[in-house]
Design a protein with these regions (language model features):
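Non-transmembrane catalytic domains and loops of membrane-associated enzymes and transporters
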Residues: 1-159, 163-166, 170-180
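Juxtamembrane inter-helical linkers in multi-pass membrane proteins
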Residues: 83, 191-205
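Membrane-embedded multi-pass helical conduit in multi-pass membrane proteins
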Residues: 113-195, 210-278
Length: 281
């Protein structure tokens, strides 16, 4: 399921649970467990566990407002990145109980959907921060990403965008690495503390939504690091790693200037320290 779905009432009845309000003592039925902030994803696993089938309709059923600024986007994407790891044990239990032999592609897609945000973003950070010089120097390595980017560009084209928008999307995804990791960290925090994370609703306000300073500073720090890594690799004669770091740094620089803006990013960075100084005074 997603933000838009058509459900059968019998299906909801099958996954419903009965609970008691701790304050009033009244009993109630809960159809969506609301254990994570991506409750629709967990409900889809519950439906499959009960033997129901889910069908994807590859078209827009409705339109949702796009986050107007980086601060609102941070809230949305951090929420989307939170919950997949928490649902994974339930999915693995389902796969163990009911081996999906003929539905192995479905199992692969479900596992990938729940774990990809954590795996991809952690993998990118490791790739950026640790010197895999001999591996990156292999000229065949860039070809491994060609199929992925070709399919990505094809999907963008089918959705009505230009294929060249692929570079803008990739730049945005680079800038969102700290945000996605923040959502993954909240999943781990909930797993340890057993406290359900607060649902951060995407703001729909006229004024700009300020972004937490950490999510603005981190892309700047990563850009500076990639620039220095490109210079160091070039000095050492490592051409392919230098090109890769230079391209990623350039795309991050573009993302910061286009999707955040220099003035707004500066305002977000100094906003909290100033408020603390005033409060202390």
């Amino acid at each position: 399921m997603g933000a838009n779905a058509v459900l059968r009432k019998r299906a909801l009845e099958d996954i419903a649970t009965t609970g008691t309000d701790p304050e009033t003592g009244a009993s109630h039925r809960r159809y969506i467990q609301d254990r994570t902030v991506i409750e629709d994803t967990e409900s889809s696993v519950d439906l499959v566990k009960r033997g129901w089938q889910l069908f994807n309709y590859p078209a827009r059923l409705s339109y949702s407002a796009t986050p107007p600024d980086f601060g609102a986007l941070v809230i949305q994407r951090r929420r989307w990145a939170n919950g997949g790891l928490l649902i994974m044990p339930k999915l693995l239990g389902l796969l163990i109980q009911r081996p999906l032999r003929r539905r192995s592609p479905e199992a692969f897609m479900r596992v990938h959907y729940l774990t990809s945000i954590a795996a991809v973003n952690v993998g990118l950070v490791l790739l950026f921060l640790f010197p895999f010089t001999d591996w990156l120097a292999n000229e065949w390595l860039p070809l491994t990403a060609v199929a992925y980017f070709c399919l990505y560009a094809h999907d963008l084209r089918l959705a009505g965008y230009r294929r060249l928008d692929l570079f803008r999307v990739y730049a945005l995804n680079l800038m969102l690495i700290p945000v996605n990791l923040g959502g993954v960290f909240r999943s781990l925090q909930q797993a340890v503390t057993k406290r359900t994370a607060t649902f951060g609703r995407t703001p729909k306000v006229e004024n700009r939504t300020a972004a937490p300073a950490i999510y603005v500073l981190a892309p700047y720090a990563l850009t500076a690091y990639l620039c220095s890594a490109a210079g160091f690799d070039l000095f050492e004669g490592q051409v392919f790693p230098a090109i890769a770091s230079g391209i990623n740094a350039s795309l991050l620089f573009y993302a910061l200037s286009t999707f955040v803006g220099w003035r707004d990013s500066a305002a977000d960075i100094v906003r909290k320290p100033r408020s603390r100084l005033r409060a202390g005074a």
